[in-house]
């Protein structure tokens, strides 16, 4: 058994956040429980615009060294939101089995592109589990 606190940077109004990665020592737990904590008052501010992060061109390439690289592009589309210096985008890779259950996740970070422009990303994975489908999601970081 273990416990891990995962803090996410920001969520825009009505935005769904997908967070993928590994926790613990890599051993699949029997159960997973999530608890959303109430933020401290100083962490809640009025939205200063919004941003969305569409992903396109996602593909996979099997590498000669046994790894698999998932590639794609992510755009930053803002409506009044101004990123701070050094602001990044987190890209999460999600693998699903034939029942649609999430069985694996990994992540990468990319620099924030100019508004409406794309930034390429690559997520290298070794020892993939058997999976049926994959998808990627992006969020502000």
Summary of predicted features, one role per range:
Residues 12, 27, 63-65, 84, ...:
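Surface-exposed coil/turn segments at beta-strand junctions on protein surfaces, enriched
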Residues 40-104:
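Surface-exposed interaction/gating patches
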Residues 8, 23-63, 105, 128-141:
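Terminal connector regions
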Residues 4, 19, 70-72, 89-91, ...:
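Hydrophobic residues positioned within well-ordered beta-strands of beta-sheet architectures
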Residues 2-22, 102-124:
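A cross-kingdom feature marking solvent-exposed beta-strand/loop segments within repeated
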Residues 1, 27-32, 92-93:
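Intrinsic low-complexity repeat tracts in disordered regions, enriched in small/polar residues
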Residues 84-85, 90-92, 96-97, 101-102, ...:
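C-terminal functional regions that serve as terminal interaction/effector modules
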Residues 24, 75-77, 126:
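Acidic, Ser/Thr
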């Amino acid at each position: 058994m273990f416990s891990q606190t995962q803090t996410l940077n920001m969520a825009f109004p009505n935005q769904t956040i997908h967070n993928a990665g590994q926790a613990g020592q890599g051993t699949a737990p029997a159960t997973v429980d999530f608890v959303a904590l109430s933020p401290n008052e100083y962490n809640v501010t009025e939205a200063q615009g919004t941003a969305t992060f569409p992903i396109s061109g996602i593909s996979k390439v099997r590498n000669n060294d046994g790894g698999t690289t998932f590639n794609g592009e992510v755009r930053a589309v803002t409506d009044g939101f101004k990123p701070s210096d050094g602001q990044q985008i987190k890209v999460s890779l999600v693998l699903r089995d034939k029942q649609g259950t999430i069985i694996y996740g990994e992540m990468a970070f990319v620099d924030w592109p100019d508004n409406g422009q794309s930034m390429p990303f690559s997520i290298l994975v070794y020892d993939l589990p058997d999976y049926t489908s994959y998808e990627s999601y992006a969020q502000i970081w």
